[in-house]
């Protein structure tokens, strides 16, 4: 989930919802990566560009962040791409940072996340905070986990038969 008591994750969770992070000040990461839709936008392809909006959950275990960009091997490197892309969030880095620095509560959140930083509200701090929040997003529970949690209808009939056979045969 996005709730966290860790200052870096908390700042990142706040930035995921922060519209001022975009060049036009009107778009947040969560507008496209909607928690209620599995951190996607629910569409087969996102406009513009024709690619889908990838889910944000489960990225802590990934080593690559896109088949089309094998050079992107860290989440931070992947996050820099939409932040700099005019078709997505932006590239107005200085104007974006100025808007963020104008909010004393947000500057204080950066201070809690980066207590020893000589300068607060930098692009790299923002990327690090976003990465910490995204790394903390857990994948949704699979059918077997839901079954163990008491959801008797979680497994499809064939899976229930397989599970019964597994239990029977040990």
Stretch-by-stretch model annotation:
Residues 1-170:
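Periplasmic c-type cytochrome electron-transfer domains
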């Amino acid at each position: 989930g996005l709730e966290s008591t860790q200052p870096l994750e908390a700042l990142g969770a706040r930035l995921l919802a922060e519209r001022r992070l975009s060049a036009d000040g009107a778009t947040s990461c969560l507008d496209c990566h909607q928690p209620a839709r599995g951190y996607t936008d629910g569409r087969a392809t996102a406009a513009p560009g024709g690619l889908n909006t990838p889910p944000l959950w489960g990225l802590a275990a990934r080593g690559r962040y896109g088949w089309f960009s094998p050079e992107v091997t860290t989440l931070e490197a992947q996050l820099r791409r939409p932040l700099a892309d005019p078709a997505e969030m932006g590239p107005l880095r200085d104007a974006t940072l100025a808007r963020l620095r104008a909010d004393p509560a947000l500057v204080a959140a950066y201070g809690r996340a980066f207590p020893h930083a000589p300068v607060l509200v930098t692009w790299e701090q923002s990327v690090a905070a976003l990465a910490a929040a995204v790394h903390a997003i857990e994948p949704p529970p699979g059918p077997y986990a839901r079954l163990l949690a008491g959801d008797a209808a979680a497994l499809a009939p064939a899976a229930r038969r397989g599970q019964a056979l597994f239990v029977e045969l040990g």
